[in-house]
């Protein structure tokens, strides 16, 4: 749920450990 929506990954994903995702969809 982190590659579909850049905000969705913050809500329901174990990747919330690091806010900067490995994919360039989330520049923050």
From Swiss-Prot:
Residues 1-28 are annotated as: Disordered. The keyword Nucleotide-binding does not apply. Keywords: Seed storage protein, Storage protein. The keyword Zinc does not apply. One of its GO terms (cellular component) is cytoplasm. One of its GO terms (molecular function) is nutrient reservoir activity. Residues 9-20 have a biased composition (Low complexity). It comes from the Eukaryota. This is Omega-gliadin.
């Amino acid at each position: 749920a982190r590659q579909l929506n850049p905000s969705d990954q913050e809500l329901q994903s174990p990747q919330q450990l690091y806010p900067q995702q490995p994919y360039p969809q989330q520049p923050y």
